[in-house]
Amino acid sequence: EQALSALDEDLEQVANSVPKSAFTYLKRVTIWVEHEQDFPGGVYHPSAQWLLNNGYPEEWAKGIQIGNAANYMSWVEQQPAMVLHELAHAWHHQRLGYDDPDIEAAYTAAMESGIYDEVAYASGGTAEAYAKTNKQEYFAELTEAWFWRNDFYPFVRDQLIEHDAL
């Protein structure tokens, strides 16, 4: 119950942060919360086939899985915008398409410039930004910074505007 209450609060934060039209769409994305699955966090599932091949229900396609309600509270301490991050994957996949040329161009330019090679991390120190993983993670990480707070630098919108020309 504590995790579901925290998830409700996080979704309220998302509702208050993103444009209303975007949140109206994002409310359609199903979020599956599992009690104690051995799963490392939250994940957006774009593919029904992948789910079937890996023993998960195909109904989870185009939805978000939070793999362990008991761990949700500790996850969001390190990644406060975790739900927004996964919803950003849904938006990217369903509304923009993973082949969106603007996102591809921004990701390529950012990777070529090296601006995410070593950045500050919210809990201290520096690390390679998770945004470097691929263009999907780039979009989701920058969405966190734009609308809420990211766990990797740039943490918030003003820093993002200064750090990444997009």
Task: Please name every model-derived segment.
Residues 1-112:
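Acidic/His-rich structured neighborhood in mature extracellular/periplasmic domains
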Residues 52-60, 67-69, 73, 77, ...:
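Metalloprotease/metallohydrolase-associated module, dominated by Zn2+-dependent proteases
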